[in-house]
Amino acid sequence: MNVIEEIHRRLPNTHLVMHGSSSVPQDLQDIINQYGGEMPQTWGVPVEEIQRGIRHGVRKINVDTDNRMAITGAIRKLLIEKPGEFDPRAYLKPAKEAMRKVCAARFTEFGSAGHAGNIRALSTAAMAKRYASGELHAKFGGDAAKAAAE
């Protein structure tokens, strides 16, 4: 996190990505293992650390493992509790709900909940035009260049 903070200090307009930043919730790991899974004990990135990264320029966080754990746990649970169930609609519904809960929690924890109205959809052609014009090119100069040189 110190490196992320230093990058943000030197290049405050640079957006960063945290790869492999799932929190790997213990409760989801427990559900998977309780219902026949064999997921070894593991840990992820604490949500508090991700929040710290967000305060210092992180704008994309890869947390898919948490979603996969929620889905897997819900499916395993239903298939153990209802072994005669074979209709995917029956076990995909709770899986989708489990994933929705994880996503809703992350939206809130990461400060993005309630901002959907601020997003304006653009066509591929409109985005191509913005890239071609240079509008979206990284800008290094001014105070950011001075800070990076320090």
Label each PLM-derived region with a short phrase.
Residues 1-18, 22, 26-34:
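Alpha-helix-loop-beta-strand connector modules within alpha/beta enzyme cores
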Residues 3-5, 38-41, 82-85:
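Short, surface-exposed linear patches
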Residues 16-19, 39-41, 59-63:
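Hydrophobic faces of well-ordered beta-strands that scaffold small-molecule active sites
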Residues 19-25, 44, 64-66:
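Active-site beta-loop-alpha junctions enriched in small/polar residues
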Residues 34, 45-150:
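C-terminal alpha-helical cap/extension of soluble enzyme domains
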